[in-house]
Amino acid sequence: MVLAAAMSQDADPSGPEQPDRDACIVPGVQGPPAPQGQQGMQPLPPPLPPPPQPQSSLPQIIQNAAKLLDKNPFSVSSQNPLLTSPASVQLAQIQAQLTLHRLKMAQTAVTNNTAAATVLNQVLSKVAMSQPLFNQLRHPSVLGTTHGPTGVSQHAATVPSAHFPSTAIAFSPPSQAGGPGPSVSLPSQPPNAMVVHTFSGVVPQTPAQPAVILSIGKAGPTPATTGFYDYGKANPGQAYGSETEGQPGFLPASASAAASGGVTYEGHYSHTGQDGQATFSKDFYGPSAQGSHAAGGFPADQAGSMKGDVGGLLQGTNSQWERPSGFSGQNKADITAGPGLWAPPASQPYELYDPEEPTSDRAPPAFGSRLNNSKQGFNCSCRRTKEGQAMLSVRPLQGHQLNDFRGLAPLHLPHICSICDKKVFDLKDWELHVKGKLHAQKCLLFSESAGLRSICATGEGTLSASANSTAVYNPTGNEDYTSTLGTSYAAIPTRAFAQSNPMFPSASSGTNFAQRKGAGRVVHICNLPEGSCTENDVINLGLPFGKVTNYILMKSTNQAFLEMAYTEAAQAMVQYYQEKPALINGEKLLIRMSTRYKELQLKKPGKNVAAIIQDIHSQRERCMLREADRYGPERPRSRSPMSRSLSPRSHSPPGPSRADWGNGRDSYAWRDEDRETVPRRENGEDKRDRLDVWAHDRKHYPRQLDKAELDERLEGGRGYREKYLKSGSPGPLHSASGYKGREDGYHRKETKAKLDKHPKQQQQDVPGRSRRKEEARLREPRHPHPEDSGKEEDLEPKVTRAPEGTKSKQSEKSKTKRADRDQEGADDKKEGRGAENEAGTEEQEGMEESPASVGTQQEGTESSDPENTRTKKGQDCDSGSEPEGDNWYPTNMEELVTVDEVGEEDFIMEPDIPELEEIVPIDQKDKILPEICPCVTATLGLDLAKDFTKQGETLGNGDAELSPKLPGQVPSTSTSCPNDTDMEMAGLNLDAERKPAESETGLSPEVSNCYEKEARGAEGSDVRLAPAAQRMSSPQPADERAQQSSPFLDDCKARGSPEDGPHEVSPLEEKASPTTESDLQSQACQENSRYTETRSLNSRSPEFTEAELKEPLSLPSWEPEVFSELSIPLGVEFVVPRTGFYCKLCGLFYTSEEAAKVSHCRSTVHYRNLQKYLSQLAEEGLKETEGVDSPSPERSGIGPHLERKKL
């Protein structure tokens, strides 16, 4: 028999120290906490006011205790054979505590892993139970009973158990002996309470610690242990829950409950244990009690070990543990008679005590703590069950009541919920009801009143931790283990989860328990939204918690079953969603463990679950990769609609379990946009109709997407690169893509594409001009985006316009192109070209609008023939530009080197002239530029020229400024043209040279020409169709420009008139440039292999200048790509023959023209300097553009370069 030596201690002894002790204060018993022992480690839960206890029960208890003492080896007269000496006891206690703490720490570490937690809890419970003295030792050590003179903490557990009157017997180890038995001091213990010093023989009892020996021996000890949660069996977590409470090995609350429970009866320990109330904290356990009760926190196992070890101590230990509610046959009777033994609090019907149920509300609080603790052990939510909630009436529930309480599906319908008195007509209504607030509240109240506290409010019933720990008052004990008394609490938990009280989700243990025994690993999902729920939605609910092995989606009944790979995963899922209801399309779902299936044997017809899940995962991965690639809200590079997750954003919680279960990406991370695409890709058919989705995107996005996004789609691969640029400024992206196109075209003989485009450009020329005029204004704002901060600063007035125009153009282009692609490429080309001319989207449109050139360049990069064909196709259908863009993108990177391969490195300069149209004087310059073509071959230089030409007037001014500011200009140029940025260093030197040279030459026209040439060269190198398109749009003006430009440029070199001309003609040039471009395209076609072509390109350079203005934007994006390859010599015009070949931009001499113009002009340094220079020109050009008529003194500064270029 287990002697529960409850020492009735004066209320005072415990004092405030009690909270620190591990001894649990039984909620029912009110009394000052016993003083904390030296080893007291954990604060006791605050004692609840003791229910009034009939005095009659106390004598009975005393008598029982006396009997137990007589029988118990630890009887008052005899020493506890297990206790050798206070020192050894202390040592044992310390060791036990240390071991327990370690185990607990391990348990905490695995809290999120229900399987591991369960195993660990079992081990812990076994360890605790296996040590007869462990609980005892632990109690004093944990509780640190201060009474023991030896310093052994006498955990006078103030067990104000609800079950125990304030006079509840406190088991105190002999304080002097440092008896392992914690003294549960029930400070308010009535004086008449029979105080039996548990170790009177062994250790003198402190007068303050009168020990009342409860005859717990029968079943008490074990039950007490069980009270502590059939720790080893089902509630190891709960047992530790007390630890979570702060008691090393016990759930403080449970300990309290156990104490109270134990106190309540002779077998209160066992009773407490059963109830999981074994709320006598460790204190509670007298030496005897500790042995079995030490389990206080450790259920069955302790009892088992206690049996052997403390068999003498606990006569009914095994049976008690096994029969938590009965606390063993002996205790069971006692417990059942508990009301008689212990007068239940006036409010509590002890006579109705159910061994499975907590002894009393007060005890249940401890028990509740226990449940909470176990929950903590498992779910760290043990505290959820409030002690108040934990306090449940002792009244047992009827079987049907338990079923309703647990939320089990009724056997017959319609069914009236015995808890809520609500009639339900079908299972769906029942599930809704069970998960509803009304039922949860009723269950909570009922559990409090009926002592079902152990039943965790597993709204699903699945999560009920109670199942795990009978301590939870496993209503299942009543239901499943009707005779829980015989069964250990562990058994009870079978359906403990059935409890729907959300308050008691010791779900993990209960859930595991319940599910393992019942539902298995299948989760039942109800209330799915009608018609809008897909398989992916359902699967996504489970993926965060682990692998989903199978599922059934019953759309007709709006329910689904998910089979998880592991029971723990299913339980975790249910528990989580009970706490945070899942939502699909804004509708809450009812998720619980399935009582119908333990596992899904049937396979999804037609669709392989693994395949669907794999699709979901793969899409998530893709989304993750794309998101990583994405910068900002831009669309994924891939056109594939699959860029987005197949399934809608997961509704499942982002809980830590997601990472733990790692069955896939966090569905909660999925985007809403992903979810939008889901309907098309639902059922895992993400691959289905990607083209359709793409078409859909193309149809709708052109209006919705930014110009950047449109370009991205239109240009495909180019869009990929440009995304990064786009994110910052769409203009640069386009220009970048244009630049790429130029490079490709440059390599690819874009002249053919341009020739093809000439008609288009001509067609587009008229509207294009008007647009160009408008967009010329808009381009200025654009330039800041394309051009870097320097450009933005210097060119802000103009740049601002340009970016806006470019954006609108590009947006229109992309939209128009897509529409046209869907409808006709011709319309798109027109708009695109107009946009190019206007927004200087020459590059983009070279890529997009004049896909012929762009495609040719892009695809031509892949193959020269495809280039031409693509150019034609692009011209015919801009929509082709997208695919071309995709192909082009990868090829473009590789093809940058194609200039060398094509052998037109310095020659191929098919410019995208759309933007040059703005500046008519540039056309003249362009003519001159063809002469300078070889120099212009430096595409970057041409691009820069474009930018400046775009700026028009600004170019002239920029030139003037450049001569004084060359170093500064170089940076600004680099700003406008990132390529130049690469060449900043050299550019500074070159600028220094240029300053003198420009000053000497004083040819602002040359400067503008040079820039134009550069622009042309850049575009020529790019050989974009955009210029071609522009040329086509306005072939005549282009011709005129070509004619005018070359002479005019020459003249300009001699004089600064071109500067004025470009400034004045910037709108005119825009218009004329298309024509010039058309002619130039023809020329470029011829001259692609020649410098002559470069010259023709130069004649287009005004447009190119605009394009370049954009290009500066693109150049930044290209800078890493193009400059890294540096396959295209740019700014060749800056290389001037002197004693050697001198680069004005970089200030470097080369003995060989090839080394200077080919190698050097491809160098990063040269590119950077050219960028800087063009940026400066662009800035100046913007300023001049604002004052269109203002000639460019700066151009005169740039002139020297242009002259040298001409030379």
Curated annotation (Swiss-Prot):
Modification comment: Phosphorylation regulates the subcellular localization. Phosphorylation of Ser-638 and Ser-640 in the RS (arginine/serine-rich) region promotes nuclear localization of the protein. In contrast, phosphorylation of the C-terminal disordered region promotes localization to cytoplasmic ribonucleoprotein granules.
Start-end of Polar residues biased regions: 853-863, 970-979, 1073-1102
Outcome of swapping S640D: Mimics phosphorylation; does not restore nuclear localization
GO cellular component annotations of the record: cytoplasmic ribonucleoprotein granule; nucleus
Domain (RRM): residue spans on this chain: 521-596
Subcellular location: Nucleus; Cytoplasm, Cytoplasmic ribonucleoprotein granule
PROSITE patterns linked: RRM, ZF_MATRIN
Zinc finger (Matrin-type) stretch: 1141-1172
Keyword Glycoprotein among UniProt keywords: no
Bias type Pro residues, positions: 43-54
Residue positions where Phosphoserine is found in the record: 638, 640, 643, 645, 652, 729, 789, 853, 864, 879, 881, 963, 999, 1034, 1046, 1057, 1066, 1078, 1096, 1101, 1190, 1192
CDD domains according to UniProt: RRM_RBM20 (cd12685)
Disordered: annotated segments: 1-58, 625-686, 722-896, 951-1110, 1181-1207
Disruption phenotype: Heterozygous or homozygous adults display left ventricular dilatation. Left ventricular diastolic diameters are significantly larger, although there is no differences in the systolic ventricular dimensions or contractility indices. Subendocardial fibrosis increases with age and was accompanied by electrical abnormalities, such as widening of the QRS complex, atrioventricular conduction delay and a predisposition to arrhythmia. Rats are at risk of sudden death caused by heart failure.
Chain intervals with Acidic residues compositional bias: 839-848
Region (RS) location: 631-650
Residue ranges with Low complexity bias: 639-650
Database matches in SMART domains: RRM, ZnF_U1
GO molecular function, one term: zinc ion binding
Any one GO BP annotation for this protein: negative regulation of mRNA splicing, via spliceosome
Bias (Basic and acidic residues) ranges: 625-637, 668-686, 740-759, 772-789, 796-836, 867-876, 1011-1022, 1050-1072
Oligomer status and interactors: Associates with components of the U1 and U2 U1 small nuclear ribonucleoprotein complexes.
Function: RNA-binding protein that acts as a regulator of mRNA splicing of a subset of genes encoding key structural proteins involved in cardiac development, such as TTN (Titin), CACNA1C, CAMK2D or PDLIM5/ENH. Acts as a repressor of mRNA splicing: specifically binds the 5'UCUU-3' motif that is predominantly found within intronic sequences of pre-mRNAs, leading to the exclusion of specific exons in target transcripts. RBM20-mediated exon skipping is hormone-dependent and is essential for TTN isoform transition in both cardiac and skeletal muscles.
Protein name (database record): RNA-binding protein 20
Organism whose genome encodes this protein: Rattus norvegicus
The encoding gene: Rbm20
